[in-house]
């Protein structure tokens, strides 16, 4: 079986050959735990959980190390703790616990290691000292900064010309910087802020050095795959590469860099000002999106229907379609025993996590090999048990008829054919089906008692 992944560093799809097949090593940037995670963060969690599952399937579950960090020292954390009047550790512990609930709700496996930044100060200080000793970092007014010209091919990951990056960095450049692109490795901490003793005084780390330190501690100086959202390519991942390569002297930090695409909500960029900022916790536990709660399996399948590198429009309609698909699959597989995933399904995932093609293969298995359908869903991390219980009490033919009528009514509503919509509602009511048109546009249903 040959795995092929798109490498952001080379801008091409490449055959994947791990450094050590008995110890495949993956790092993905985890959350900064100051608030609930939004659904864009959820996409990253699902994508790299699927990668973890696929690698475990290919190399064995005991031969893959997946590290996903927790950033628990950050200016946003300090500000939120002060705003709420709570201790920083109380805030980060609370948000980490909610994050774990959300990740589990999306069907994500725990990573092999989940390091916290605050537990890796010694590693951060050690890397910074290496950079100073090698002339790649300098001390200025209590700060330690990375000297970007020390990295000749800085910008190789983002493919940004250096002049463009310099132009973008010229706004309010700190006077202690030698160059506008230089970035902070260590900075002084105010008495009211968290701080750690270092050779350069009491302070705290910059964001980028945290991931370099944690990946080094748990995966080594060079590892197989580094991942995250596309928004992290620059500056975060670019800076990680620069400081890690300069500290350890290797030509690469990770052999493959994988990034998932952007997410928008109902056709618009997600933002609090637009009122379309959607958190994972809200989707799983409240009726704030589409007027109802959504099972984690529905959220996961809705994400996986779009290839991970493509932008995705997260909509109520997409969730409804994913739920209908899962309901059909559950009825098709009722009474079947799980089997090994189908070879064509595995081939699809092996081709740069081609989930749209993999899902198409599952549709083909629905009638002829329901056990293989279950095996494929298990590998995708989609749990049919997440769905509600309403359709379990129905014969398959009755369930399919109900779903078809609901879909017809939805089409009538979209075309503002209210008479047809009412006719279909009445027909469903005669079958004992009660519809609820929720405030966000989603339609839910239940059987009359």
UniProtKB/Swiss-Prot annotation:
Catalytic reaction equation(s): tRNA(Cys) + L-cysteine + ATP = L-cysteinyl-tRNA(Cys) + AMP + diphosphate
Chief location of this protein within or outside the cell: cytoplasm
InterPro entries, per database record: Cys-tRNA-ligase, Cys-tRNA-synt_Ia_DALR, Cys-tRNA/MSH_ligase, CysS_C, Rossmann-like_a/b/a_fold, tRNA-synt_1_cat_dom, tRNAsynth_Ia_anticodon-bd
TM regions (residue ranges): none
Cofactor binding description: Binds 1 zinc ion per subunit.
The EC number(s) this enzyme carries: 6.1.1.16
Residue ranges of the motif 'HIGH' region: 31-41
SUPFAM superfamilies found in the cross-reference section: Anticodon-binding domain of a subclass of class I aminoacyl-tRNA synthetases, Nucleotidylyl transferase
CDD domains, A to Z: CysRS_core (cd00672)
Pfam families, sorted: CysS_C (PF23493), DALR_2 (PF09190), tRNA-synt_1e (PF01406)
Record's subcellular location: Cytoplasm
UniProt-listed Gene3D superfamilies: Anticodon-binding domain of a subclass of class I aminoacyl-tRNA synthetases, HUPs
GO cellular component: cytosol
UniProt keyword terms in alphabetical order: Aminoacyl-tRNA synthetase, ATP-binding, Cytoplasm, Ligase, Metal-binding, Nucleotide-binding, Protein biosynthesis, Zinc
Single Gene Ontology MF annotation: cysteine-tRNA ligase activity
Record keyword Ligase present: yes
Residues that bind ATP: 272
Protein residues bound to Zn(2+): 29, 211, 236, 240
Superkingdom assignment: Bacteria
GO biological processes: cysteinyl-tRNA aminoacylation
Family: Belongs to the class-I aminoacyl-tRNA synthetase family.
NCBIfam families found in the cross-reference section: cysS (TIGR00435)
Subunit structure as annotated in this protein's UniProt entry: Monomer.
HAMAP family per the UniProt record, alphabetical: Cys_tRNA_synth (MF_00041)
Full protein name: Cysteine--tRNA ligase
Source taxonomy: Bacteria, Pseudomonadati, Pseudomonadota, Alphaproteobacteria, Hyphomicrobiales
């Amino acid at each position: 079986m040959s795995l092929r992944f798109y490498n952001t560093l080379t801008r091409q799809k490449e055959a994947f050959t791990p450094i050590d097949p008995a110890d495949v090593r993956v790092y993905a940037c985890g959350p900064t735990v100051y608030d609930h995670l939004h659904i864009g963060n959820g996409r990253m969690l699902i994508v790299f959980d699927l990668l973890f599952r696929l690698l475990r399937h290919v190399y064995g579950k005991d031969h893959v190390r997946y590290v996903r960090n927790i950033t628990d020292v950050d200016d946003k954390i300090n500000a939120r703790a002060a705003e709420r009047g709570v201790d920083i550790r109380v805030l980060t512990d609370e948000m980490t616990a909610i994050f774990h609930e959300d990740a589990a709700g999306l069907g994500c496996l725990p990573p092999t290691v989940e390091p916290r930044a605050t537990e890796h100060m010694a590693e951060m200080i050690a890397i910074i000292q290496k950079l100073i000793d090698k002339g790649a970092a300098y001390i200025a007014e209590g700060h330690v900064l990375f000297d970007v010209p020390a990295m000749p091919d800085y910008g190789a990951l983002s493919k940004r010309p250096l002049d463009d990056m310099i132009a973008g960095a010229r706004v309010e450049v700190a006077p202690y910087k030698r160059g506008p692109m230089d970035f902070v490795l260590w900075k002084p901490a105010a008495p009211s802020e968290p701080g750690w003793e270092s050779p350069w005084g009491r302070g705290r780390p910059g964001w980028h050095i945290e991931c370099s330190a944690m990946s080094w501690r748990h995966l080594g100086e060079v590892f197989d795959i580094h991942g995250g959202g596309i928004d992290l390519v620059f500056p975060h991942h670019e800076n990680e590469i620069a400081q890690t390569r300069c500290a350890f002297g290797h030509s690469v930090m990770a052999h493959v860099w994988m990034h998932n695409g952007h997410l928008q909500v109902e056709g618009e960029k997600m933002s609090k000002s637009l009122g379309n900022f959607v958190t994972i916790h809200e989707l799983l536990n409240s009726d704030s999106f589409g007027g109802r709660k959504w099972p984690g399996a529905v959220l996961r399948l809705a994400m996986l229907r779009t290839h991970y590198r493509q932008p995705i429009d997260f909509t109520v309609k997409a969730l409804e379609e994913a739920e209908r698909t899962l309901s059909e699959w559950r009825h098709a597989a009722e009474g079947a025993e799980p089997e090994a995933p189908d070879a064509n399904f595995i081939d699809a995932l092996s081709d740069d996590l081609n989930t749209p093609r993999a899902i198409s293969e599952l549709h083909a298995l629905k009638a002829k090999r329901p056990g293989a359908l279950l095996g494929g869903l298990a590998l995708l991390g989609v749990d049919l048990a997440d769905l509600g219980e309403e359709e379990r009490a129905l014969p398959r033919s009755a369930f399919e008829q109900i779903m078809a009528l609901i879909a017809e009514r939805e089409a009538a509503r979209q075309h503002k054919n209210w008479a047809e919509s009412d006719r279909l509602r009445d027909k469903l009511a005669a079958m004992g089906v009660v519809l609820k048109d929720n405030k966000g546009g989603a339609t839910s249903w239940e059987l009359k008692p």
